[in-house]
C-alpha cells in the first residue's frame, strides 16, 4: 500500500518559444506567486505557489490539446470567473456535478484548467 500524504505539485508544459508569455499569464492574469526554482534543471521553466501546492511550468514542443486538466478549489468561484473574464480569458462550463460548482478555461498554450467550489450545507 502507498500511504499518500498530499499532492506536492502540478506540472504543465508550454511551447519553448512561449515560456516567458506563460510566466506573464500566470502572474499577471491568474495572479500566482512565483517561487524559487532550483538551478539544477537542464530545461528552463518557472515555479509558482497555489496554496501549499507547487505549480510548475516547463517546456515541450509539439503539444496537443486533450481533456487532461488540473483542478483547483477556490474560495469564491464567481469572483475567480470575473477576474479571469475581465482579463480576456474565456471560461466555459461542462456537466454539472451535484456537490460543486465549477468552470474551465484554457491558458494561452492549450492547458485546460478547472476551478471549483464545493457547495456547503
Model-predicted regions and their roles:
Residues 12-54:
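Core segments of cupin and vicinal oxygen chelate
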Residues 66-84:
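Mid-chain, well-packed structural core segment of small domains
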Residues 45, 54, 71, 102-103:
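Short hydrophobic/aromatic beta-strand element in the GNAT-like acyltransferase core
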Residues 1-5, 85-121:
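Vicinal oxygen chelate
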Residues 40-44, 64-66, 97-101:
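Short acidic/glycine-enriched loop/turn segments that link adjacent beta-strands
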Residues 1-23, 68-70, 121:
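N-terminal beta-strand motif that seeds the catalytic metal site of vicinal oxygen chelate
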